[in-house]
């Protein structure tokens, strides 16, 4: 442990539950922090709990670190965590600063399979874009035909997102007019948004043009900041763990009508 800590003194997080968390792991972490890192002018970044009663152990470990004057040392938890276990730990008052989520982040346990297909939606012939469609017995695998763009609609009053909207590429959304948006498969589900009560942002941006990379790459921090900013524009109800509010990706009337027309023609 001493070799590792002296080699990587600026980013040292110690796993403390390998043998005995409270009798061995945490005391040795305190020893490393006080006798190895602090004399180097460095600080132990944190400790990690990966087994046992994490809520109880985090409280005891926090107290031990604080008594030793190591209030700056953070405590993280891992061990097959998911959103429900994390919520439970927080509700129990666990003294944790961060969570390491692995296997339950790779695949969504509640929806492990994403229904969909990646198919041709148009061809270019003699300078014209000709829409194409894939037909399937499963509605989620029926493609939306044509060259398209995606918008996000926001309420003017709250600044919150209403829905995303897929439109033909040459369709312009006029915010001074009423706008009716339609469910992609359940065509009786639609919503009309009154004129001058919403704004529109286009979501797609060019990455390559004529074979050239034209996108301005962002740093990890910029990506995180943007994600947090966009998350704040969604309703809190979308993030409920139980019975969350659905956020829809709808179609314009033009696109829906054209899709239905193509389906009817292909099924004749």
Where do the language-model regions lie?
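Gly/Ser/Thr/Ala-enriched C-terminal appendages of enzymes
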Residues: 73, 81-268
């Amino acid at each position: 442990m001493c070799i590792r800590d002296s080699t990587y003194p600026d980013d040292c997080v110690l796993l403390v539950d390998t043998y005995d968390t409270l009798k061995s792991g945490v005391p040795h972490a305190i020893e490393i922090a006080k006798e190895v890192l602090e004399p180097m002018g460095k600080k132990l970044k944190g400790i990690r709990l990966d087994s046992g009663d994490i809520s109880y152990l985090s409280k005891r470990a926090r107290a031990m670190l604080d008594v030793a004057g190591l209030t700056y040392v953070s405590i993280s938890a891992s061990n097959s965590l998911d959103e429900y276990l994390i919520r439970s730990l927080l509700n129990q008052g666990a003294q944790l600063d961060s969570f390491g989520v692995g296997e339950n982040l790779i695949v969504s346990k509640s929806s492990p399979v994403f229904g969909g297909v990646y198919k041709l939606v148009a061809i270019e012939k003699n300078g014209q874009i000709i829409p194409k469609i894939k037909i399937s017995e499963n509605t989620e695998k029926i493609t939306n035909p044509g060259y398209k763009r995606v918008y996000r609609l926001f309420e003017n009053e709250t600044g919150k997102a209403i829905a995303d909207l897929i439109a033909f590429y040459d369709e312009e959304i006029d915010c001074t007019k009423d706008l009716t948006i339609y469910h992609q498969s359940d065509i009786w589900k639609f919503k009309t948004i009154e004129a001058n009560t919403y704004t529109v942002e286009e979501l797609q941006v060019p990455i390559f043009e004529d074979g050239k990379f034209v996108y301005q790459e962002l740093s990890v921090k910029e990506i995180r900041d943007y994600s947090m900013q966009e998350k704040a524009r969604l309703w809190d109800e979308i993030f409920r763990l139980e019975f969350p509010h659905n956020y829809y990706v709808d179609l314009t009337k033009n696109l829906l009508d054209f899709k239905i027309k193509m389906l009817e023609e292909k099924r004749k």
